[in-house]
Amino acid sequence: MISPLAYVDPSAKLGKNVTVHPFAYIDKNVEIGDDNEIMPYASLMSGTRMGNGNKVYQGAVIAADPQDFAYKGDDTLAIIGDNNVIRENAVIIRGTFPGHAT
């Protein structure tokens, strides 16, 4: 179920049985597997790759730009596996260098 109050970019790829709550944000270039739950105000930014069975709580941000002076704006990834719980206001940034991931 995707709330009509959530933003999901039309190019984002969502698996089966994904719940996206109101005010969640899912950017372009995002891939989400099956059985995930994205809570209100969570943000999955460009470069997010998420497996199955995860829960992302309020205010968490995944695949934000790296907080590293070496980052030059390259396309990098944040890869989240299966069956994780990402709690409130956690920040998981993307890799810093081209072809890298966290």
Each model region followed by its residue ranges:
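A structural motif detector for beta-strand N-caps
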Residues: A6, A12, N17-V20, A24, ...
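Beta-rich strand-turn-strand
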Residues: R94-P98
